[in-house]
Each structure stands twice: as C-alpha cells, then as structure tokens.
C-alpha cells in the first residue's frame, strides 16, 4: 500500500460521526457533495466564478445520471431558468464532469427514498426535467451566507451544510471532544475532517479549482472510498 493510499481516516470518533452523518443524508452514494472555498485570497476575488463553475459541474452530475447526453447547452438553459441573474452571462468554459469516473454517473439508488433523517429546507422540484436536482447536496464551505450559496440552493432544494447536521448525536459527541493534554476543544479542528469524510462517501464530488482540500477529497479520499485507482504524483 502506497503512502497516498494510507491517507484515509482511521480515527474512530471521526468515522462514527461521519457514518452517522452519511446515514442522515440517506446513506453512501445517495447524495452529491461539493467543496466551495470562497473566503480568502484569490478564492474571495473569484467567488462568483467559483460558485458558477461548481454549479455547472454539479448539475451535470445530477442530470447525466438520468441523461448521459446532457451537455453545456442543456445546463445553460437550466441556469437561465433557476438562476435568472446569470441569464446575461455566456456559459462558463469549464469541464462539466471533472475527476469523476464515468461509473459514478448514474442515478443514486436511494436519493429520493424516505431513509433520510435530515429535513430539506427547500421546496422539491416537481417539473420532470428538474426532478434529478432533488438529490441531496452536501456543501463543505468556508462561507455559509445565503447570498453566496443562493445559486446552489436554487438548483438543489436539499442543500445541506454541516451545521444542518448538528442534531445528529454522534456529531454532537465529536463537537464536545477536548484534548486530554491541555483541555482545548477539538471540535473546530475536527470539523474540516468531518466535512471531508462525509464528502468521500458521496455519489459524486466536485471541488474548488486550486484548493488543496478539494484536491485531497476529489483525487484521493473519494477514490479510496469507491475503490478507484489513485494516481501517483511526484
């Protein structure tokens, strides 16, 4: 086993909490996941472009699960419908499905089932062409304000952040952990790891270009969780 293949999570507290969170979302491979980094440096300057880029890639994943031929033109029309403030913009030049193996481009088997323990805040789509977007979307982000994430919520009515899972008992337990050495609360340090562990068990995952966290989740953790080969670098 290579060093990269050993970079998954083994901490029992983290595994217990992430498994409970995944189950609350409906189970492994029943939800999409995205990492949206927006708050600092170049990411702050490019926040609108970043949200639009991941929006296109997420919608492509959801739509191609039921229609493999869905392309940029189809998704652009959906954007004009769901995010009218972007209607004057040309389609972004981004790969629609990047770093997601073709095997992942299938409908999640239980995404609409009643197994989810978390309540979706948005109103579910009823139009047939939009129903695939009812799939739960887990969002890991450093900016949780409604305006920044509004395009995602408009497309995915079941958009869920880590804070929305705070009632899951195992997550509350993780948040209460303290260091045995100095009594420092560990919750804030474990939250990004919990985000990553949840994302790794999504049906498909999309990240922010240039983010090392996104690269780790997309290129290593998600692939480990799904039994795909990990590309060796350097």
Regions found by a protein language model. Give the residues of each.
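Core catalytic architecture of nucleotide-activated donor-dependent transferases building glycoconjugates
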Residues: 1-176, 180
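A donor-sugar binding/catalytic signature common to diverse glycosyltransferases
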Residues: 190-234
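Long, positively charged, glycine-interspersed low-complexity recognition regions
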Residues: 153, 166-189, 193-209
């Amino acid at each position: 086993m290579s060093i990269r293949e050993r970079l998954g999570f083994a901490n029992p507290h983290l595994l217990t909490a992430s498994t409970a969170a995944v189950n609350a979302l409906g189970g492994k491979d029943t939800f999409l996941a995205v990492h949206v980094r927006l708050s600092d440096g170049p990411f702050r300057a490019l926040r609108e472009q970043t949200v639009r880029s991941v929006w296109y890639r997420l919608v492509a994943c959801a739509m191609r699960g039921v229609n493999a031929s869905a392309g940029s033109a189809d998704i652009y029309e959906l954007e004009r419908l769901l995010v009218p403030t972007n209607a004057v913009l040309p389609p972004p030049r981004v790969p629609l499905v990047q770093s997601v193996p073709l095997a992942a481009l299938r409908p999640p088997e239980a995404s609409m089932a009643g197994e989810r323990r978390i309540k979706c805040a948005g109103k579910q789509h009823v139009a047939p062409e939009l129903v695939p977007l009812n799939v739960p979307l887990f969002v890991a982000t450093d900016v949780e304000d409604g305006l920044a994430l509004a395009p995602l919520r408009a497309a995915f009515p079941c958009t869920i952040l880590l804070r929305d899972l705070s009632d899951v008992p195992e997550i509350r337990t993780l948040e209460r952990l303290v260091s045995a050495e100095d009594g420092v609360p560990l919750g804030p340090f474990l939250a990004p790891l919990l985000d990553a562990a949840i994302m790794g068990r999504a049906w498909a995952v999309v990240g922010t270009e240039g983010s090392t966290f996104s690269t780790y989740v997309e290129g290593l953790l998600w692939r480990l969780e799904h039994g795909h080969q990990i590309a060796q670098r350097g």
